[in-house]
Design a protein with these regions (language model features):
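Large intracellular
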Residues: 1-143
Length: 143
C-alpha cells in the first residue's frame, strides 16, 4: 500500500475540478460500458465488436477495437500510453480516459457488469457511486 502511494500520480489528483455536467456525462458513459461488459460476458468478442462498431467516443472506441482483436489488460494499458492523442489532456478528458481504461480492464477480465460500473463510478465521487446503486436497482426491476 505504501509503495502504491509513493508511486501515485499526484499531478492527476491536483488538477482542476471537473464540472458537474461532465461528471453526469461520464456517469452515462459508465452505464453504457456496464452494458457492454454484460454483452462481453454473454457473447465474448462478438459483443465487444458490435459495441465498437456503434461507439462514437474516441477513447472508448479505441479500446473496444483492441479488445475485439483479443488484447488483454496489459496490452490496453500499453496502447493507451503509446498513443500520442492521449498524452496532453484537459482535466475532464483525463478523467474520462482514466475511467474508460479502468472499465476496459474490467471488460477484458470478464468481470461482472456491477463490478465494472462500481470501478468506473469510483472516479466520479461518492454521490455517483450511490447513483450507480440506484441505476443497477432500476435495471434489475426492468428485467
Amino acid at each position: 500500500m505504501i509503495r502504491a502511494l509513493a508511486t501515485a500520480d499526484w499531478a492527476r489528483w491536483k488538477s482542476a475540478p471537473v464540472s458537474r455536467q461532465k461528471k453526469d456525462a461520464l456517469f452515462e458513459l459508465a452505464c453504457r460500458m456496464a452494458l457492454v461488459a454484460a454483452d462481453a460476458r454473454d457473447k465474448d468478442e462478438a459483443g465487444i465488436a458490435a459495441a465498437a462498431a456503434s461507439e462514437r467516443k474516441k477513447t472508448l472506441k479505441f479500446g473496444l477495437d483492441l479488445l475485439a482483436q483479443g488484447a488483454d489488460a496489459e496490452a490496453l494499458d500499453q496502447a493507451y500510453e503509446l498513443e500520442p492523442v492521449f498524452r496532453e489532456l484537459d482535466p475532464g478528458t483525463r478523467l474520462e480516459l482514466d475511467m474508460v481504461r479502468k472499465g476496459l480492464v474490467s471488460i477484458a477480465a470478464r468481470e461482472h457488469p456491477v463490478v465494472a460500473l462500481r470501478r468506473m463510478t469510483a472516479f466520479l465521487g461518492p454521490e455517483y457511486f450511490d447513483k450507480a446503486s440506484a441505476w443497477m436497482t432500476d435495471r434489475i426491476k426492468k428485467r
